């Protein structure tokens, strides 16, 4: 018989950083479109696997010089390459023992609800009374909470004692009954410092508007995050003034064409292409992840510690109203021998 300890040890060998287990009864208050039993009626346990987003993958955005790394290596690469392999291989181990396992490495683009939480109009229909409309979507953050990985912070992000908000979560729904982990008491990490509110570049996290929900017997409350606004702020867009035309998303989104320009936390004239399907985080999760992480590290609450603080200088901003900074140096090694290359004093002596 496979035990919870066997599962956790195997998951970490396969690449997970943290692992938690929740009994299926903890989802008794889940909306039907987010209920694991809609996928596996005989489910007994949910296993949540946490994969750290490297602090270094945020460094380039913090410095304003290397934006693709977070979307590629810290977000998309984990979500679409690294995490699925671990989730699939752990599911194989469970099924080899005779218990069915549903691997879920990320949210499906086929889900019936949109990014805000409403059913998509004329998208899919239940196949029988009492069943959810396909596809069901399990909230990975809620799963992390119910499996004991961490708590839901004011920003709606899952916060863990190891990495704070720097985490991606995959889950396995299984009919294997496992010993569950205790749920973290809300307020253990998040003290409502509102750093996420202050630093969100689009004001998407309101200080005075919240959502309340009973999750696993706990009364939780988090910000009523404006997910529609976050969608274009996250990608580096800013609304244009009345009568002004913006072309930042032109050629990328017909619905957004002409409506947005680059924001002051974005150095790109036009929206770069996606990396790994959804990777386009120009804002670098400035409020919900970076500001929160900085706050938690300053308070000494995270076990993943570093020799130096993350932020060592004043955050930069792009002034799009001013003249562009002139680039008067060689852009590549190939140009270093050109006649226009500036030479050092030692080379000209």
Task: Report the location of each language-model feature.
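Extended, amphipathic alpha-helical scaffolds
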Residues: 333-349
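Catalytic cores of enzyme domains
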Residues: 30, 72, 76-294, 309-312
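C-terminal/domain-terminus segments
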Residues: 298-328
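Non-catalytic, usually N-terminal nucleic-acid engagement modules in DNA/RNA processing proteins
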Residues: 1-88
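Residue-level signal for secondary-structure boundary sites
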Residues: 55-57, 180, 300
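Short alpha-helix boundary/capping motifs
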Residues: 39-40, 122-123, 316-321
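Short conserved micro-motifs at the rims of enzyme active sites and ligand-binding pockets
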Residues: 58-60, 237-246, 302-305, 348-349
């Amino acid at each position: 018989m496979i035990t919870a300890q066997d599962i956790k040890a195997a998951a970490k060998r396969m690449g997970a950083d943290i692992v938690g287990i929740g009994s299926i009864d903890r989802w008794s208050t889940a909306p039907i479109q987010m209920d694991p039993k809609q996928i596996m009626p005989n489910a007994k346990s949910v296993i949540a696997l946490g994969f750290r987003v490297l602090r270094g993958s945020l460094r380039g955005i913090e410095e304003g010089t290397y934006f693709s790394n977070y979307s590629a290596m810290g977000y998309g690469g984990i979500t679409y390459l690294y995490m699925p392999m671990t989730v699939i291989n752990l599911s194989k181990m469970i099924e080899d023992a005779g218990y069915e396992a549903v691997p879920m490495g990320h949210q499906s683009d086929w889900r019936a609800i949109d990014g805000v939480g409403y059913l998509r109009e004329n998208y899919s229909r239940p196949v029988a009374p009492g069943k959810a409309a396909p596809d069901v979507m399990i909230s990975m953050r809620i799963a992390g909470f119910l499996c004991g990985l961490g708590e839901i912070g004011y920003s709606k992000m899952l916060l863990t004692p190891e990495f704070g908000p720097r985490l991606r979560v995959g889950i396995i729904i299984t009919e294997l009954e496992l010993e569950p982990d205790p749920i973290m008491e809300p307020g253990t990490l998040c003290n409502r410092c509102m750093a996420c509110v202050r630093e969100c570049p689009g004001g998407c996290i309101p200080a005075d508007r919240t959502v309340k929900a009973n999750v696993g017997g706990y009364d939780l409350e988090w910000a009523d995050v404006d997910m529609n606004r976050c969608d274009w702020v996250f990608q580096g867009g800013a609304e244009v003034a009345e009568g002004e035309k913006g072309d930042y998303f032109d050629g990328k989104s017909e619905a957004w064409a002409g409506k947005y320009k680059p924001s002051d936390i974005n150095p790109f004239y036009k929206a770069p292409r996606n990396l790994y399907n959804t990777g386009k985080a120009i804002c670098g999760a400035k409020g919900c992840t970076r500001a929160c992480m900085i706050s938690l590290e300053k308070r000494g609450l995270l076990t993943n510690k570093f020799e130096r603080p993350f932020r060592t200088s004043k955050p930069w901003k792009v002034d799009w109203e001013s003249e562009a900074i002139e680039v008067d140096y060689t852009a590549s090694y190939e140009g270093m021998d050109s006649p226009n290359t500036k030479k050092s004093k030692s080379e000209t002596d």
